Amino acid sequence: MHVMQCKQTGFTFIELMFVIAIIGILASVAIPQYQVYLNRARVAEAFILLPPIKKAVATYYAHTGEFPTDNHAAALPAASLIRGDYVSQIQIEHGAIHITLKLSSLAEGAQPEQGFILSIRPVQSPEALPYLYWLCGEDTQLVAPTKAVGENKTTLPTQYLPSHCV
């Protein structure tokens, strides 16, 4: 008598469940990291719009020895007219540049109604005159007589700041 042996082909149900569990674990790590990547890319748009704004502030400072109080003083359009896909406005306030950003859902919670703010402030240093340096994002302890001009209104979570801002 001849007995046929069946060879198992394909995957069993338990093996498939393990594969699905592993994919789920990988996705739970990858999706939040991808969200951080997307928001950092969106913040980068602000730095594309920034050079003419910084130039206007520096030009005003070079001519007057003071910093512009607002967009109009710096000969720039109104804050709401300087926008991009993720930048809703760029406002100058006493020399500081405040960029309002609209970002997609953040891990820390819901986005504020008005958006997140990233402040770029000029730094005055007697040794560096006539040049201006720019301080981005978080407050940094500066050694006297060096001082940052304007108020830091940054509300953007640190993880979304470009590496040169941290």
Task: Identify what each model region corresponds to.
Residues 46-64:
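N-terminal alpha-helical signal peptides/signal-anchor transmembrane segments
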Residues 17-30:
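Alpha-helical hydrophobic helix detector
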Residues 62-166:
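Periplasmic/extracellular, small/polar-rich flexible segments of pilin-like filament-forming proteins
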Residues 11, 29, 41:
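Short beta-to-alpha loop/turn elements within the nucleotide-binding domains of ABC transporters
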Residues 36-50:
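Membrane-proximal amphipathic alpha-helices
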Residues 1-14:
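N-terminal leader/signal peptides at the extreme start of proteins
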